[in-house]
């Protein structure tokens, strides 16, 4: 009988990133992966990183180093780095950390289960997955929530058009894309059915909703 694959997950950064983490966890669960606490041994660990400010980047790098040490000790078989730091640094992250097995950019999140399957199956010679920013909002339903049961974050848009000098968000998250109100309502209904009583709307630029 084949062993059930296990995965641990570290979610860093903002609430928007947490929504992405929950979406990836949901997809991995649908593909048969069992989530285990990150202190326990697992087949794979996914680190959903933040790359916004220097302190966040340093935190992400510290967690990558910690998980690579666990890989050396045999506690995990593979390390996948996803999210904003991966999107910002791309393949240079593999040069900095050659023991990382795969990097997945922000817009490759919905392919995380395929990446995990190929990695465990020894099929994935390519070590990076980066997709262009989509022209339509991504569907965040079918999440495995890691917030307390009574509340959840609901992402109503992605990206930003402002390109402020001090901010890297447009380079990591792309241009602003409004999530259609029908999709927002459908996600809200799904979350309410899952026991959520407090919805927190999040976006990179909430005041720009519907103006793109």
Range-by-range predicted roles:
Residues 1-209:
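Proteins enriched for Cys/Gly/acidic motifs involved in redox and nucleic-acid/cofactor modification
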């Amino acid at each position: 009988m084949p062993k059930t694959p296990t995965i641990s997950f570290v979610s860093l950064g903002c609430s928007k990133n947490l929504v992405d983490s929950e979406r990836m966890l949901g997809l991995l669960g649908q593909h048969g992966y069992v989530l285990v606490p990150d202190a326990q041994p697992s087949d794979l660990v996914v680190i959903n990183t933040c790359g916004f400010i220097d302190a966040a980047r340093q935190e992400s790098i510290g967690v990558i180093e910690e998980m690579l040490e666990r890989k050396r000790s045999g506690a995990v078989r593979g390390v996948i780095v996803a999210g904003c730091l991966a999107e910002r640094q791309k393949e240079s992250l593999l040069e900095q950390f050659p023991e990382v097995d795969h990097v997945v950019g922000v817009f490759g999140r919905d392919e995380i289960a395929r990446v995990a399957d190929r990695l465990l199956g020894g099929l994935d010679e390519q070590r990076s997955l980066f997709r262009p920013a989509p022209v339509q909002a991504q569907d965040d339903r079918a999440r495995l929530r890691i917030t307390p049961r009574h509340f959840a974050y609901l992402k109503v848009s992605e990206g930003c058009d402002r390109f402020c000098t001090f901010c890297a968000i447009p380079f990591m998250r792309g241009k602003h894309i409004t999530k259609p109100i029908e999709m927002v309502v459908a996600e809200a209904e799904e979350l309410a059915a899952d026991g959520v009583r407090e919805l927190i709307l999040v976006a990179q630029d909430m005041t720009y909703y519907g103006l793109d």
